[in-house]
Amino acid sequence: MTIKAILTDIEGTTSAVSFVFDVLFPYAARHLPDFVREHAGETEVAAQLAAVRAESGEADADVERVIAILLQWIAEDRKVTPLKALQGMVWAQGYRDGQLKGHVYPDAVQALREWKARGLDLYVYSSGSIQAQKLIFGCSEAGDLGSLFSGYFDTTSGPKRESASYARIAGAIGLPAAEILFLSDVVQELDAARDAGMRTLGLAREGGSLDGHPTVASFADILVE
């Protein structure tokens, strides 16, 4: 069946894992406490703080306790939706201020542009919030790549290692799963996408293979039929 859409992961796939762990996460950890203190009374931020209290089971946590929980989640690399949303808000401020530029591999930039020009629909699925995804591509070192994408998906669509998440995304895209190619550097994510009926391709940028899936080292090596 012909591929009509491409769904791509970010970390380790379109972008260096080091950008997320060495640049974005430390930036959020440094700036998140003051950001929460300054904006805790705003509706959008307050909603996420309430979600932190619910997720942690600490309904009476004050702002300082919520900040401590968030910093602990960052240290543990927890994929928790309210944390991702708040990190996205902090990063948005950093991108607006010119302190951050999203990293996207040059081979990924070229391939994404070529696929878009060929009429393929491009989508992102990452554990980072949709807001954070848009910032990485919209404020990238290669310029604004946001217009290349038709949609973004995050953990609100479900965990990345569960096949139901990919079935849900295929439904949202409006295509049979078999017409969607999923790109990732994580075997468990590729397995889940395949179980949902998607085509899969692994990215192993340091070489090697991802068990049970076709694997390439660069977007330049991807042939979409």
Curated annotation (Swiss-Prot):
- Which cofactors go with this protein? Mg(2+)
Q: GO molecular function of the protein, one example?
A: 2-hydroxy-3-keto-5-methylthiopentenyl-1-phosphate phosphatase activity
Give the reactions, separated by semicolons, that this protein catalyses. 5-methylsulfanyl-2,3-dioxopentyl phosphate + H2O = 1,2-dihydroxy-5-(methylsulfanyl)pent-1-en-3-one + phosphate
* UniProt superkingdom: Bacteria
Q: In the UniProt record, does the keyword Hydrolase occur?
A: yes
Q: EC no.?
A: 3.1.3.77
Q: Which cysteines are joined by disulfide bonds?
A: none
- What keywords appear on the UniProt entry? Amino-acid biosynthesis, Hydrolase, Magnesium, Metal-binding, Methionine biosynthesis
List the CDD domains.
HAD_EP (cd01629)
Which pathway features in its UniProt record?
Amino-acid biosynthesis; L-methionine biosynthesis via salvage pathway; L-methionine from S-methyl-5-thio-alpha-D-ribose 1-phosphate: step 3/6; Amino-acid biosynthesis; L-methionine biosynthesis via salvage pathway; L-methionine from S-methyl-5-thio-alpha-D-ribose 1-phosphate: step 4/6
Asked if the record carries the keyword Magnesium, the reply is: yes
UniProt xrefs under Pfam families: Hydrolase
Q: Write out the GO biological process terms.
A: L-methionine salvage from methylthioadenosine
For this chain, the family text in UniProt reads: Belongs to the HAD-like hydrolase superfamily. MasA/MtnC family.
Which NCBIfam families does its entry note?
enolase-ppase
* The protein, known as: Enolase-phosphatase E1
- Gene that specifies this protein: mtnC
